[in-house]
């Protein structure tokens, strides 16, 4: 925690930030890596440090604040575009936030920096597979997703 070094970043803080990354990316029609890269390590550390208070705000306000603060722009990627032949259900932004939070948590060593792990996970090629809701990757067990991350592919 950059503001209170004696207070550790919790899994709930990580989950909130991953959820907001997903929500912001969907709102802007961007891939989640775009949001992560625009924030960068310092901003991710800040967001993780203040997640305990940010979760009290309306999520739409957090999206608007991130959009302004980090100069985020709209794109043309629609993660929610699915093929009805394969699935009829789109996971919620909270569900996908939890998927990414578990993955980030699983690869972060004890006492490690969640911001570094967020940057690493979201830059991984497996994110394109997780974010393809026509596949089953997003609802695979966490240990399978971690193995895929470590192997660089599903």
Task: Locate predicted features.
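Intrinsically disordered, low-complexity and often Lys/Arg-enriched segments
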Residues: 1-4, 71, 153-154
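N-terminal interaction modules that seed assembly of large macromolecular complexes
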Residues: 4-66
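A structured, charge-rich N-terminal accessory region that forms the first stable segment of a protein
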Residues: 8-11, 86-99, 104-107, 112, ...
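Surface-exposed polar/charged interaction patches
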Residues: 27, 42, 69, 102, ...
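Short, surface-exposed acidic
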Residues: 29-37, 73-80, 110-115
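Substrate/cofactor-recognition hotspot
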Residues: 48, 57, 67, 74-76, ...
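Long, compositionally biased
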Residues: 53-92
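Glycine-rich, aromatic-bearing surface loops/beta-hairpins
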Residues: 120-154
């Amino acid at each position: 925690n950059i503001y209170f070094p004696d207070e550790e970043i919790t899994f709930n803080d990580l989950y909130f930030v991953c959820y907001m990354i997903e929500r912001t990316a969907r709102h802007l029609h961007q891939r989640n890596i775009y949001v992560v890269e625009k924030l960068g390590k310092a901003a991710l550390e800040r967001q993780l440090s203040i997640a305990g208070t940010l979760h009290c705000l309306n999520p739409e306000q957090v999206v608007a604040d991130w959009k302004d603060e980090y100069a985020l722009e709209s794109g043309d990627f629609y993660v929610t575009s699915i093929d009805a032949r394969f699935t009829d259900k789109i996971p919620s932004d909270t569900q996908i936030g939890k998927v990414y939070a578990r993955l980030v948590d699983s690869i972060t060593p004890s006492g490690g920096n969640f911001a570094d792990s967020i940057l690493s996970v979201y830059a991984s090629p497996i994110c394109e597979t997780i974010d393809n809701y026509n596949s089953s990757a997003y609802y695979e067990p966490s240990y399978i997703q971690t193995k895929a991350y470590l192997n660089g592919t599903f």
